[in-house]
């Protein structure tokens, strides 16, 4: 079995989501769908490694100010299709990022307030048919985690497996916390550490809430305009 974790200099939380079984006996293809944090610090050798891995499309979910602060290393690369598809803009972030009690509440806010953007992102994933695709945000946990969860749901991966995949982020982001810790004011360290946590129950609660509100994840996807045709395209491209 291929290694799920791809360890490259200058990037955190880079993982292949291949290998997961679906409820109908298929599996997510390896080397088709990757997830990660931001790419601005990739070394030249790491950029070449991703090229050699076959990467041809990048979907960057970050906001405009994030792009200014940390430009994407592949934004102008030849042979790479770069799509900046933010889940919300700098203004909308004030509503989406308003204080919440739990991570699940944050994700449900995304589910409710970012429907046009989620539709665009999932439609773009469905269009990539023949080479690895990388979805990323800042640390590859929240925005990326939700997009990957909805994609895996569309493919027929069971909720508990989706929650397990989401939960892997914390172990991959702990080195980021260790690296940044000296520069973080002591009074903000607990908040930063909480930001990189990825408890599996947060994704379990999110998927359960979608089921409660919409009847099923499939119904929610239909609300987004991700109907049978796009689902079949996703399955054809990403399953074996």
Locate each region found by the language model.
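Ser/Thr-glycine-rich phosphate-binding loops at phosphate-binding pockets of nucleotides
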Residues: 139, 143-144
């Amino acid at each position: 079995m291929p290694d799920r974790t791809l360890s490259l200099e200058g990037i955190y939380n880079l993982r292949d989501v291949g290998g997961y079984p679906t409820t109908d006996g298929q599996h997510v293809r390896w080397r088709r769908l990757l997830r990660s944090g931001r790419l601005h610090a990739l070394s030249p050798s790491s950029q070449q490694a991703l090229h050699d891995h076959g990467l041809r499309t990048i979907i960057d979910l970050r906001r405009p100010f994030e792009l200014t602060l940390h430009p994407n290393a592949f934004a102008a690369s030849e042979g790479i299709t770069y799509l900046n598809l933010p889940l919300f803009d700098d203004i909308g972030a004030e509503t989406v990022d308003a204080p919440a009690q739990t991570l699940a509440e944050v994700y449900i806010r995304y589910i409710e307030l970012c429907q046009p953007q989620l539709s665009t992102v999932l439609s773009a994933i469905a269009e990539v048919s023949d080479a690895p695709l990388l979805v990323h945000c800042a640390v590859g946990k929240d925005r990326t985690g939700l997009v990957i969860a909805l994609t895996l749901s569309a493919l027929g991966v069971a909720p508990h497996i989706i929650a397990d995949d989401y939960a892997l982020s914390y172990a991959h982001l702990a080195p980021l916390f260790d690296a940044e810790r000296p520069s973080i004011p002591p009074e903000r360290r607990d908040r930063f550490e909480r930001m990189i946590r990825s408890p599996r129950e947060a994704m379990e609660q999110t998927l359960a809430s979608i089921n409660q509100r919409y009847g099923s994840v499939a119904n929610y996807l239909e609300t987004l305009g991700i109907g049978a045709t796009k689902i079949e395209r996703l399955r054809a491209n990403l399953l074996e």
